[in-house]
Amino acid sequence: MGRDEMQMSEAKRAYRSAKEEGNRQEEARWANVIGDILKNRGEYVEALKWFRIDYDVSVKYLPEKHLLPTCQSLGEVYLRLEHFKDALIYQKKHLELAKDASDLVEQQRACTQLGRTYYEMFLRSDDDHYSIRNAKKYFKSAMKLAQTLKENPATSRSSFLKEYIDAHNNIGMLQMELDNLEEAKKLLIRGLEICNEEEVSEDDDGRSRLHHNLGNVYMELRMWDKSREHIEQDIIICKKIEHRQGEAKGYINLGELHYRVQKYDEAILCYQKALNLAQSMEDEDALASQIDQNIETVKKAIEVMDELKKEEQNLKKLTRNMIIAKGTSQERKSLLQQNASLDCLIEKSSMIFAWLKHCEYAKRKKRIASELCDKGKLSDSFLVIGESYQKLRKFNKAIKWYTKSWEMYKSIGNLEGQALAKVNMGNVLDSNGDWAGALDAFQEGYRIAVEANLPSVQLSALENMHYSHMIRFDNIEEARRLQHEIDKLKESKSEDLEAYDVAKDCCSETDTEGNDHLPDVRSSACFSAEMSKSDSGRSKTLAGLEEVEDDEPLISFLRSSERLPKLKRAYVEKQNIPTEPRELTPKTLSKSTNSQQTGGGRKRIRVVLSDDEGDIDNEEGLKGRLQKCPVEGVATFDASRWFILLVWQDVPAADFKCTNSSENPINVEESTCSHKFTSSNPTNQYGNAIRCTGKVFIASDVNDDQCVTFRIDDDLIQLEVHSCICDDKLDIESLKVELACLYYLQLPKEKISKGLLPIIQHMKYGGRSLESFDAFKDQLGKDIIEVSIDGWVQKRLMKLYIECCKELSEAPNMKLLKKLYISEVEDEVVVSECELQDISVTPLLNALQTHKTVAMLDLSHNLLGNGTMEKLQQFFISSCQNYVDLTLDLHCNRFGPTTLFQICECPVLFTRLGVLNLSGNRLTDACGSYLSTILKNCKVLYSLNIENCSITSRTIQKVADALGAESTLAQLCIGYNSPVTGNAITNLLVKLDTLKSFSELNLNGLKLSKPVVDRLCQLAKTSCLTHLMLGCTNLGSDGSLQLVESLFSRAQESVKLDLSYCGLESTCIHKFTASVSLVHGILELNLGGNPIMKEGANALASLLMNPQCCLKVLVLSKCQLGLAGVLQLIKALSENDTLEELNLADNASKELTLQQNLSSVNSENLQPALKTSDGVSKEVDTDQQGLCAMNTDCNDLEVADSEDDKIRVESAASGFDNSCTSSCQKNSSFECQFIQELSSAIGMAKPLQLLDLSNNGFSTQAVKTLYSAWSSRSGAGPTWKHIKEQIIHFSVEGNKCCRVKPCCRKN
């Protein structure tokens, strides 16, 4: 380090001297040298600053050729920081400059860097085929250029040998990612041979890379000794050349090698050495974090190994007992116990990759199944044995046992088993190089799965077929067709696939032994770990059903064995609902960004295709990034553990719509990091509206019977109005806004330049005011609606935006225009949900540059990335505002950690930024230091939201460290991040306790331990908290009670409290409502997802009827209240003057009969008045009542035949019409009585503005009756309904349901 410091000192001295002299070339050169020294130290952020100085000086003062080295340096540093989009910008510029200069040397370097970047993107995306294509393209180009330069060196000093060797390394690691291990081994060995032939130094870094990757290849081939030899050689070289990052990653690989062979102590020692090296480098937080996770994984594996040893002892005991039970009535029971024990051992051995043991246990299971005469268990055991041999890379034996399994399943008619076996055979054939045979097997498995109606196995087979066509055969058209099939199947099974959303920190089974760790995109259909549960569960079922037969001799089962498979449970039922990771795999990272690969490849499911087949330039493909949660669902196939979670947007990458109001697709933007803009098609710019004079022209994509023609003055405007219709009601205001925007766009230039937009006042059809869609829906496209303008309003920003669109030849975004039109304050720019991307937002940002003044900028729910933030930074710097507080809402976009770096580089924001919302962006722990800087320097920042940003304890701790007593922070949201430890949260709470103005805290989704709850209670006592969001925190009844007591232990402002999904019970609710302070201290209360039952409804009804109750919002969805509880709560509102919103969705369980609810209603809730002192309703003997059941298939209320049909109840609520009674002649009077009682209660709930009754099984007629009651309430004003299938929302005009996303609600 002494030499480094001396070099740094000399370089800085030379830089200062060159700057003072005005020698720009030397100034840039020395800035680059300083950056290079810092880069080699691992101080990438600091290096980036110096490389940018080099870049800025070169751009301003030097010829273009001087940009070559600085673009190369910037690209490399951004790559090391994993800012891939930024890296691609400079690397592509580097390549362009090199081509312009005809410089083959620089072209080769640029191609190598581009290949590395796309390769790293592929490793992290798991579904980005464009990246792997680009990686292949650039690596092959780099190798050709290196070979050309080697054969024809530019100078005698430069042979380009090093680059030629690196090219072998790069393509070798790429082949390893594609599961072509033999080809990869051949290339890497050839690289070492070239080193020896050309007498390259033994300590050359090129050799270290080759050794590194060869170590990985041999590890996948289970050639442990050779793997260790190459990994250790890699470490030795890196140590000699002082390449700490490479040395650390070498130790990571060595640790994984020890882990694979169950040498856990040695593994931890290696990981600890790697951790020490990573921590000694400045900007290697991600590497250190990864190593920490690996150490934790090894510790868990040690626990599993201990459990396995205990279970082995149990199996030995059971085996001894079997000797005694042989020939007795206990023989079968003893065999079943051994089978269950072996299932457990198979599961645990697969978790720690002990495949030899796994094979041993599987064979013992086969023997037990034979003795049990159970063909179902026998076929299962064949499947597990096949898996063992597959993981041991004995593919011929694996095929043999999978074939046996398939034949056995076929003999007993088990279609599911046949399908699973076929898909597994395909996996083995693919690994063995028989790609055509693999595809045939996948197709056969799919055919069987379709025949048996097994959606999950169909999905697995389709994904494997997609992989084969895309990766193996490069058949894009067929892959696209299969992708469409996959999407349709996933959409139809969306509820089942939700079970795949598991902890993000579990390690992927794809990083396993044998095929596990290979870059295979194939999905898995068969498994061992989950089979153990499935099989164990099936054994219990068999045992339960045949318990009386356990004493029969085993010979008797030879006759009955053919019927046993009928009791067999489907594997896939278990497979699709994994609860925890089945295999514990340390994650390996790429050894170095210098053309090296990760320690282990990943499997991928499938590739998202778009129509772009050009340069395969698909940074855009990242915008719908599908994040995978690694889970052991099926042990035999590797890729099926990667399940899909859509993290950032609701819109898939290949399914973006055009940004104007037309339904016509336009060109998808090129890239978020591109600096070249793609213009939209200029024809029909405004999509669904065309201006004409005297004659109507209809756009070719517009259907006559879906269009309406409007006349404004002498102009006719035709547009589709379906976007303004909800439940047969026309949203008149939305229609007026769209008409105003369209009319303005067709005005002459001189009028547009004034920025005056029309105010649409009246719309008339046939002389009548337009109020209902029914009034004219039959005349669409035939008659003209007259529109009158009541005045004009100035919209300067809108005018500027349209001008900037014209300058860039871009079509204005209609959604954005409407947002700007309805904005009441010019300084508040709200353009959320406008489908904006880094390119399409450019006209707006250019308009803001001219507009200058902005107090609030809301860009949420778009598709924006770091490129937008760079432009925003330039806007804020150039803005003349320095003192006005700024609200910056960027949530739910595609921003990364660099976004925060841009904020840190903008001094203006230090004095202005008051609110910063970044939730829903994948910031990762790379943002930690930037967040810390923002919190320390932004003096007026009072609200920070980093919810669901993929950050961990490391970042939370940095946030805590950055908070000082002088901080103005009042609101903090950190929920739904993982993993966050209790210590990190506790440290944060301690710091928050020191803040003078802190009042709002959101910890939703974080698991809170007892010490954290205690610390939180202390904060509640000492701070004036007004918002406390604790949903899904596992608080429990005791923790919640403790917290509420602390919260109201002193005079307290009204509080908004979220305790949803915290495991609260009805007793807890009783204690809550007994608290006087709670009655008048809570404004909003969310108890959704807690099983408070009918008893809890009683307590809450008493709370609502209390005159001191000040609740405005009450959420009770999924609280198991039953229909009786729903009715009781709504009845209680007749005595409540404050509640405005009530959510009672999902409270009628499908497993409970309507009769039980209605009986309860009949016994208590249909009484004329509800007393505060009423206790829990009496239990009703359902045997004495009718068998009235809820028909959940048709979502209607129907009553089955019953002996008690003679029971009738007189119709009540005379104020309502007889529609219910007349339509229910065929149904029980209980149903009609209940609906009329509920309608009557709704009619009495006068202050209520929003009511959610979704998913409670109400029939269509019942909903109409309920809405009639809602709309007939006195003083309610105009009402609104949102009814679709089982969605039932009643609201009023000023408080429409679903108008704002939950994440966008402002306090």
Curated annotation (Swiss-Prot):
GO terms for molecular function: histone binding. Keywords: Chromatin regulator, Chromosome, DNA damage, DNA repair, Leucine-rich repeat, Nucleus, Repeat, TPR repeat. GO terms for cellular component: chromosome; nucleoplasm. Changing residue 70 to R: Abolished interaction with histone H3.1. Residues 587-597 have a biased composition (Polar residues). The keyword Nucleus applies. Residues 1-20, 573-603 are annotated as: Disordered. TPR repeats lie at residues 28-61, 68-101, 109-149, 165-198, 208-241, 248-281, 283-308, 379-412, 419-452, 907-940. SMART domains: LRR_RI (SM00368), TPR (SM00028). The keyword Transmembrane does not apply. PROSITE patterns: TPR, TPR_REGION. LRR repeats lie at residues 302-325, 564-587, 739-767, 856-879, 995-1019, 1079-1102, 1245-1269. GO terms for biological process: DNA repair; epigenetic regulation of gene expression; meristem structural organization; response to DNA damage checkpoint signaling. It is found in: Nucleus, Nucleoplasm; Chromosome. InterPro entries: LRR_dom_sf, TONSOKU, TPR-like_helical_dom_sf, TPR_rpt. Histone reader involved in homologous recombination-mediated repair of double-strand breaks (DSBs) at stalled or collapsed replication forks. Specifically recognizes and binds histone H3.1 lacking methylation at 'Lys-27' (H3K27me1). Belongs to the Tonsoku family. This is Protein TONSOKU. It comes from Citrus unshiu (Satsuma mandarin). The lineage of its organism: Eukaryota, Viridiplantae, Streptophyta, Embryophyta, Tracheophyta. The gene is TSK.
